[in-house]
Each structure stands twice: as C-alpha cells, then as structure tokens.
Amino acid sequence: MAAAAAGEARRVLVYGGRGALGSRCVQAFRARNWWVASIDVVENEEASANVVVKMTDSFTEQADQVTAEVGKLLGTEKVDAILCVAGGWAGGNAKSKSLFKNCDLMWKQSMWTSTISSHLATKHLKEGGLLTLAGAKAALDGTPGMIGYGMAKGAVHQLCQSLAGKDSGMPSGAAAIAVLPVTLDTPLNRKSMPHADFSSWTPLEFLVETFHDWIIEKNRPSSGSLIQVVTTQGKTELTPAYF
C-alpha cells in the first residue's frame, strides 16, 4: 500500500479511549499525527475529539446516543479503524450473590460496547478497514468462577465471527478481528494482583503495535479471526484459536 508506505495520517476511533489500553492507543496514534477520537464515559484530553458516553441502564438509549454523536462528529468522513478496547472483569460463580449484578456489568462493558462498535463500523469504516473487538482466551472454555465475564466474552467471539460472514453489513474488504489476551499488564491489575508473575502478562505496547500493523495491513489476520495473545517469560505470541 503506497499510502501506508508514505506514512499517511490515519483516522481511528477508540472505544474505551480512557481505559488503560485505550489511553495507550490514543497516545501512540496521536504521536504518529493520526486523528484519533475517544469514545468513553469520560473525556481523554489527548484525543483529537471525544464522544462522552452517557451512563444509562438502557442499551438502546446508549447505543442511539453514541451512534448519533459519532455521526455528527464524522459526517461523511470514513475512518481506517475502530478499536473496541472497552471492558472489565468481575468474578463469581452461579451461586454468587453478586451474579446478576456482575453479569449486568459484564454485558454493559463488553457486549454493549462491541455491538455499538460493530454498528459504527457499518456506517463509518472505510472499505478494507479494521474493527477490533476485545475477547478473552479464558472464554474459549468454561469459566465457572467468572460466569458473567465468560458469557460476555464468549458473545464477543461469536459476534466477531458473525461480522466476518457474508451479508454481515461490514464494508467491503473490512476485517473484524477479536484479540483474546490472558492478562494485560495494567496498573489496576498490578495493584489487585501484586504477587502475580508479571512476565506472563501482556504489555499494552505489544497490543498497540499489533493494532498499528493490522491497520496498515501488515500481518493482518483474516476477518473473523480470534487471536489468542499469550505472554510467557516476557515473550508475547499471537496464535489463532480454532474450533
């Protein structure tokens, strides 16, 4: 791609742009002089533009609000990538008192954001563009100790594969790819698990660089791929998950 080789400024939407990974994406792509918009419940001052998500218990309200505001922001402009890096974690088995609350939270953090990002891709992503979704390696199997998390991430995986199918509504040549990490090396994770083996955690910079490569179509997996992100003794590898 001549444009990529020339270092053309790209346009990217980061859903979850104030989270640990989202903030790194905004920083890194702004440093390349790309136009980067953050979509989150709070503004990211480093972003080129912001869409602030209103907190609500109604999915349709939130989806309509974000869709309308992104539409106003972009107009007829298309973006090169939509990176959905929103999410969170909550534990609990089927007997937990917090089961319903945690399932609700996981659904909002993972499925609401992924579904809205997917719809935004059908409206605003360039042909040949990139949509990434945040899955989880753990959700390739049963997750009895974190029921809500596993269900939500499993749904993200299914969504990703659906978007890759014929007549999904995605732009021509665009790719939907889910990244399935184990544990990301974030300040919050270090604080909550201070005695863990950090050499098995994935550095945020690795994912940022991976997204960059995929945006410029370098080593980009095929649409619908579920890419496991596994770090062992400080070395991170990307491996497709097969069923």
Curated annotation (Swiss-Prot):
GO-annotated molecular function: 6,7-dihydropteridine reductase activity; NADH binding; NADPH binding
What SUPFAM superfamilies is this protein classified in? NAD(P)-binding Rossmann-fold domains
User: Which CDD domains does the UniProt record give?
Assistant: DHPR_SDR_c_like
List every position bearing Phosphoserine.
S172
Q: Which family does it belong to?
A: Belongs to the short-chain dehydrogenases/reductases (SDR) family.
On subunit structure and binding partners, the annotation says: Homodimer.
**According to its UniProt entry, what is the function of this protein?**
Catalyzes the conversion of quinonoid dihydrobiopterin into tetrahydrobiopterin.
Q: What is this protein called?
A: Dihydropteridine reductase
Organism field: Sus scrofa
**Lineage, broadest ranks:** Eukaryota, Metazoa, Chordata, Craniata, Vertebrata
- Gene behind this protein: QDPR
